[in-house]
């Protein structure tokens, strides 16, 4: 039998040591990677329970294994809470990731070779929206759409391509697009031309839940998402759909592309969804956007160019070409200053994907630790200070000291 009193540091000190160092890094650094956030202790506790031991192929009330009466309760709570947050008719909480959620929708309604419209990866889309290196781009005939001359989503192009190519499905959503997406307009284009409409809100889900970004659920046939990022849950995925597609989507997830669901993760999803229904989460989502706008505005005042000129969400792309520094270099020097960002291609980027001409910044994690407008403005100025003198080690050290003071004052996991 197992001894309940044995702790990880006793069983595996090597893994424990690495975890402790990562804990220190997360506490000391300002996290600005737009896809990252901090899960609550309750979410992490749920994910570390005995539910990890339970196989539960199937769905609540219709399992292929016995002993599922309690995990059925957990999964149904997750489903019901997700539907309540977004006003969805039906939901599946079993996808292990956002990519698998997207794959599940594709498998439910498409055949290999079917035509699909998706946002170009080069202009802000996601790998699973038809990138040639991704399974979606290999299995289906994806036609990319992008931005207009003002770096705004080109709805006229979407309509033109829809009429020309007659896709079976149009996919909206992005991994690096700062503005609101007009989901109602996109849905009208799709449905007026006989196409289904899917929205991937992996990046925006927490903002939608908090009323800080438009909700696509009333307009879309399918809405997919991750459960981490701005939603602040465990790493995983979900699908919401019109009731008429529930059976097809459920069959596509299991037995189509997955076997037994990760019940410990679904428990953590249920906890995160309860948190997202709270008034405090509404305030959080609004603050994420406020912080992002201050961050972007301050960077512009410091001479940096923001793609699309502004942000209306949690995320922004910074074009570094006027600074004469690549995204790869900026990521490295900002990391030395304890500011964590990711290099990111800008629209029509001349640099290679591992180099890039830009960085992507996001405010979900900084907001979770209690940053407000004043801290967002300070963070932007610290970023600009580093990028003004990226090879000055004394300058980087001075910024790092100020970052450490700020993060010590506002810890992620306080007492």
From Swiss-Prot:
GO terms for cellular component: cytosol. Pathway: One-carbon metabolism; tetrahydrofolate interconversion; Amino-acid biosynthesis; glycine biosynthesis; glycine from L-serine: step 1/1. It catalyses: (6R)-5,10-methylene-5,6,7,8-tetrahydrofolate + glycine + H2O = (6S)-5,6,7,8-tetrahydrofolate + L-serine. It is found in: Cytoplasm. Keywords: Amino-acid biosynthesis, Cytoplasm, One-carbon metabolism, Pyridoxal phosphate, Transferase. Its cofactor is pyridoxal 5'-phosphate. Its EC number is 2.1.2.1. SUPFAM superfamilies: PLP-dependent transferases (SSF53383). InterPro entries: PyrdxlP-dep_Trfase (IPR015424), PyrdxlP-dep_Trfase_major (IPR015421), PyrdxlP-dep_Trfase_small (IPR015422), Ser_HO-MeTrfase (IPR001085), Ser_HO-MeTrfase-like (IPR049943), Ser_HO-MeTrfase_PLP_BS (IPR019798), SHMT-like_dom (IPR039429). The modification N6-(pyridoxal phosphate)lysine is found at residue 229. GO terms for molecular function: glycine hydroxymethyltransferase activity; pyridoxal phosphate binding. CDD domains: SHMT (cd00378). (6S)-5,6,7,8-tetrahydrofolate binds at residues 121, 125-127. It is an enzyme of class 2 (transferase). PROSITE patterns: SHMT (PS00096). GO terms for biological process: glycine biosynthetic process from serine; tetrahydrofolate interconversion. The record marks 228 as: Plays an important role in substrate specificity. It comes from the Bacteria. The keyword Metal-binding does not apply. PANTHER family: SERINE HYDROXYMETHYLTRANSFERASE. Catalyzes the reversible interconversion of serine and glycine with tetrahydrofolate (THF) serving as the one-carbon carrier. This reaction serves as the major source of one-carbon groups required for the biosynthesis of purines, thymidylate, methionine, and other important biomolecules. Also exhibits THF-independent aldolase activity toward beta-hydroxyamino acids, producing glycine and aldehydes, via a retro-aldol mechanism. Belongs to the SHMT family. NCBIfam families: PRK00011.1. HAMAP family: SHMT. Homodimer. This is Serine hydroxymethyltransferase.
